[in-house]
């Protein structure tokens, strides 16, 4: 089973879509919210090179954002 993490922020439609997709697929994941679980300064240490939200991590490695998740979700299951 893969370890999934969603790095998200409030008022982000793609963050909500990613969370909904994972929930609909019945996948368990850790949710890290900007301003609650980490601060903006920590974002790069969580997802090096990332510039947008959400960031989806599979086993600690970023696979990208929502569009990337859509392409890869079936292989993650």
Predicted ranges, named:
Residues 9, 34, 60:
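Conserved residues at beta->alpha junctions
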Residues 13, 38, 64:
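Short alpha-helical
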Residues 19, 28-30, 45, 71-76:
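Non-catalytic interaction surface on structured domains
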Residues 33-50:
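Thioredoxin-like thiol-disulfide oxidoreductase module
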Residues 1-28:
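Local sequence-structure signature of Cys/Sec-based thiol-disulfide redox active-site neighborhoods
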Residues 58-77:
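Non-catalytic, surface beta->alpha helical segment in thiol-disulfide oxidoreductase systems
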Residues 47-57, 66-67:
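Structural micro-motif
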